Amino acid sequence: MAEPAEPAPHLIVTGERVALGPLREDLVPVYARWITTLEVARGLGNTIIFTVEAEKGWYEQAAKPDPGQAHFLIYDRFDLEPIGTTGLINIDHRHGTATFGIMLGERRGQGLGTETTRLVLDWAFTVLGLHNVDLMVFAWNKSAIRCYEKAGFREIGRRRGGAVCMGRRFDVVIMDAIAEEFTGSVLSGLVPG
């Protein structure tokens, strides 16, 4: 007898090559594996080895209904494999601001991060009605900076020497995107108007 097929994941936002859905508790060990790879840890500035138990604590906090955060699981749209997590934190509805974050655990360097970033910005501006989304990235991470620029972020400043990575000091680049400059919304057609 054949194994029952795994149910299709719940997708909230679908782009051309990626889709966003809710975080899944069954993937906590995968999240822990992603965040402890050297490339991801270096990009996030982590010096801590995350255990499955520690990542479960993050998941439990991130999965709580909270108007101050919106977390997503990133899927490859074609094979529906989870490839990372993304979201907004510090959402301030009064001032219309939030901070963006992304962790691609799989399939980096294929433009999927750029599309994911655009989808989250679209969610922020179109669904949440925010005005400004910011992020911070290490200056040495040129590929991430290019990704963010392609998605609509612009550099607005630097914290000079604000980070140490592998014994060397680097600037932290501060970037933001604003609703008025965001183009190419895939969600705007869904908003009644």
Residue map of PLM features:
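GNAT-family acyltransferases
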Residues: 1-107, 169-170, 177-193
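Structural motif
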Residues: 38-39, 128, 151
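Conserved G/P- and acidic residue-centered "switch" motifs that form tight phosphate/ATP-binding loops
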Residues: 80, 111, 141, 167
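Conserved acetyl-CoA-binding loop-helix of GNAT-fold acetyltransferases
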Residues: 110-124, 142-150
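Conserved GNAT acetyl-CoA-binding A-motif
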Residues: 126-136
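Conserved beta-strand-loop-alpha-helix junction that forms the acyl-donor binding cleft
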Residues: 135-145, 162-166
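Conserved active-site tyrosine of GNAT-family acetyltransferases
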Residues: 148, 153, 175
